[in-house]
Amino acid sequence: MGASASRPVAPTASATANEKPSSATITNNTHHSADRLARIQAEANHRASRWSDAEGSKNKQRQNNVAPDVTLASLDEWNADAFSQLTHRLAATTLHNASINESLRVRDAELSNQHIFSHSVPTEAAHVTNQKSSGRCWLFATTNLIRLEVIKQLDIKDKDFELSQSYLHFYDKLEKSNFWLENVIELADRPWDDRELNYLSGSFFSDGGQWDEVTNLIVKYGVVPQSIYPESFNSSNTGKINWLMTVKLREMAQELRDLKSVTEERLQVSLDQGRISRADRDAAVLDTVRAHKQEQMKDVYRMLAIAYGRPPKPHEEFEFSWYDSKGKYQSLKTTPYDFQVKYTGTFTAKGSCSLVHDPRNESNKLITVSRLGNIWNAQPVLYVNTTPELMMDKVVESIKAGHAVFFGCDVGQFSYTASGVMDTKLYDYESAFGIKVRRREVRVEGLK
């Protein structure tokens, strides 16, 4: 779901009363991209521990005369062993002709997951939204929550009603561009191959995001019905515009780094002569660089507007019309900001927090990720680390209270779109490949 990440840090001390971390705050790589870095490091440590006695291993190898490379003799042995069992031959016959997931789907797992529930949210939208070829799942999930409240409050007859995902997407891209350039300014003294800066440069313009990122957008920009700012081709197919924007923003980043260096050099004489203090020099450099960044952001906005169309401004008035449940025409004039304040029912952008389960750390800790975000100086992305059991309890409580639930998971692993089933028992990888599906805490423990 998300954006960019590097080393984790605690939330900033400038957070509001509702945002301020407790003394239990820890730092952690919770975001999926940062988590990937942690796994790489853990695997490296694991390998290092196995290979620490390299010389001893070499001696043992010489004694046993075991070749370190793939030998042709080994190929003969492996080839004979590959299909030595009947199950291996059956798997090969089946899987080389069809999709692995289609072939290994377990019928009993599908049958045990019937879409009949003891509780459900009272208001449901008839139309299933479609993010198409984009990574905007987090925006769709959030607007799906809110649209149910709008349908209920405005008594909208059309159950296909949607809020504009592309409206939030436009401003997310605008903010992420600024967020990237501000990070570049802050890290301008580091080389491009610095691990943190290098990672940020490869992930800053992704479509993904987190709960706190979308609520930050909603608080600042509001929401609009999809009829006010509908989908464009590029909002539904983001690959090309993402590439173009990434190329342009990297060029802008280099401009800012060069400008900072030149400005510092120009003011160094005044600093050496004592005419200005170091603090004054640094402030002048920052003002100069940020002024240039503001000019760059004009180009960013222009490129986004060309690709997506110009969106309403947060306080720009629009008119929305609909039919109520009795078929009567209704209309109102409002702004995106006021729409999210007045017509979104019980939804409150900052009334919820993200619960996560990270088995590497103990429960009941507030965690964040360094440089993960979209709006500069907004509330940081925060998570409460807890147990799967508590997460499930809160989901049940929300549904019983009539509220749909925003959640994020790796849906590509054990889900089947046609039946809508998500189950770790859905695909029998173990019978075909000998791969066991283990809980994350077991996998993490195995890397220690």
Give residue spans per PLM region.
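Structured alpha-helical subdomains that flank or immediately precede key functional sites
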Residues: G2-S134, L139-K448
